[in-house]
């Protein structure tokens, strides 16, 4: 109950779903008209809650996201959320088009995967979206949430919660396509949620009673059996704003890089066995200098982007272990990667440099723009031509 309320509150606080990767999406507005070939996916899904995922077939993590989207679809259907249309739009670039079959293979026929025509207007551009973005529309085709990294990672519950909100809550007003069956289902969901409100209250009072006697029991302040020392709830503790654990850098060594300790311990507790070298790397974090190529529209050439990924989440999928960044990074960077053996391989998704970078006329050190980000101050400094 409280977990759901926390997620809903976090989603409310996120501006347009917290997606930093795109310009401000028009909340509760109809999706702009877009077609792929002679098909109109949004028109075809009218009357259902529509989930549009912008995934890149040439990206390993995107393939993993597609597989997780299929798992999420099955999970929601098992919970009774049936009237949902799932749409995946592949990137328009040639590398992604060549690997389109790999992307389509990750999902069932219940999820439509569209290949863009390179001669048509880029759908991602029309939707103000970037790689790994999720756009959730209500039954009338109005945008309820636009989630970008890191909130769109399906290892987090934000996409699932956003879909449920779009399904049962009238965030954008009434919709004539809402059926009586959907209203009855949502009423039952609301009643079931309300019936659980008394249970946490009673449990909370019970814990308060025991807290008063905590010093009498062995004089111990050890964490509970199910709690790792210094651990956080990964699913619900992700801050909804830019205030992402900056204070960790000022605490003593035992609390420094708390996200790493949490991730490693969490993985081990779930049967994910990491080697000693992997655990050391996990605590050290992934800090790589990565080269990025900005979009041609920005008029900028290749730039250098420093991604500092300090709060890692490890998850095993098949024979691979994925390493994901669970924090806000400078607007220029987005870290994600594959944790293989003793190395963290990061890829960097570049965005247009912040306005502050454009205003700084520093003598260039290279033939191309060079933007570096200070991990402590979370500020970017750019040398432009």
Curated annotation (Swiss-Prot):
Pfam families: SelP_C, SelP_N. Residues 1-19 form the signal peptide. Disulfide bonds join 168-186, 172-175. Widely expressed, mainly by the liver. Secreted in plasma. Residues 243-258, 376-385 have a biased composition (Basic residues). The record marks 370, 375 as: Not glycosylated. Plasma contains 4 isoforms, which are named isoforms Se-P10, Se-P6, Se-P2 and Se-P1, according to the number of selenocysteines they contain. All isoforms arise from the same mRNA. The 3 shortened isoforms terminated at the opal stop codons at positions 264, 282, 371, when selenocysteine has not been inserted. Belongs to the selenoprotein P family. Might be responsible for some of the extracellular antioxidant defense properties of selenium or might be involved in the transport of selenium. May supply selenium to tissues such as brain and testis. This is Selenoprotein P. The gene is Selenop.
């Amino acid at each position: 109950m409280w977990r759901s309320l926390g997620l809903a509150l976090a989603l409310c606080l996120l501006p347009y779903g917290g997606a930093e990767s795109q310009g401000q999406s028009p909340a509760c507005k109809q999706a702009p008209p877009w077609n792929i070939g002679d098909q109109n996916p949004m028109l075809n899904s009218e009357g259902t809650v529509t989930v549009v995922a912008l995934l890149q077939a040439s990206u390993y993590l995107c393939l993993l996201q597609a597989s997780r989207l299929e798992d999420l679809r099955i999970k929601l259907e098992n919970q009774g959320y049936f009237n949902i249309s799932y749409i995946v739009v592949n990137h328009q670039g040639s590398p992604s088009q060549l690997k389109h079959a790999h992307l389509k293979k990750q999902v069932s026929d219940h999820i439509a995967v569209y290949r863009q025509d390179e001669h048509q207007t880029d759908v991602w551009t029309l939707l103000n979206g970037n790689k790994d973005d999720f756009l959730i529309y209500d039954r009338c085709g109005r945008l309820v949430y636009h989630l970008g990294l890191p909130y769109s990672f399906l290892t987090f519950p934000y996409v699932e919660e956003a879909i449920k909100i779009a399904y049962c809550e009238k965030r954008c007003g009434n919709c004539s396509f809402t059926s009586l069956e959907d209203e009855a289902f949502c009423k039952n969901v609301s009643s079931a949620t309300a019936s659980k409100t008394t249970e946490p209250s009673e449990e909370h009072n019970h814990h308060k009673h025991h807290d008063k006697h905590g010093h009498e029991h062995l004089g111990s302040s050890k964490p509970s059996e199910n709690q790792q020392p210094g651990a956080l709830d990964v699913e619900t503790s992700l801050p909804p704003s830019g205030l992402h654990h900056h204070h960790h850098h000022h605490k003593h060594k035992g609390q420094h890089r708390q996200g790493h300790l949490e991730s490693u311990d969490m993985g081990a507790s779930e049967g994910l066995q990491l080697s000693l070298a992997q655990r050391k790397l996990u605590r050290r974090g992934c800090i790589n200098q990565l080269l990025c190529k900005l979009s041609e529209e920005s008029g900028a050439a290749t730039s250098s982007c420093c991604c500092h990924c300090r709060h890692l989440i490890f998850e095993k999928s098949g024979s691979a272990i994925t390493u994901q960044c669970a924090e806000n990074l400078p607007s220029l960077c987005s870290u994600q990667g594959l944790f293989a053996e003793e190395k963290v391989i990061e890829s960097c998704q570049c965005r247009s440099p912040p306005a502050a970078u454009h205003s700084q006329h520093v003598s260039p050190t290279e033939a191309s723009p060079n933007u570096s980000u200070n991990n402590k101050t979370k500020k970017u400094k750019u040398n432009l031509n």
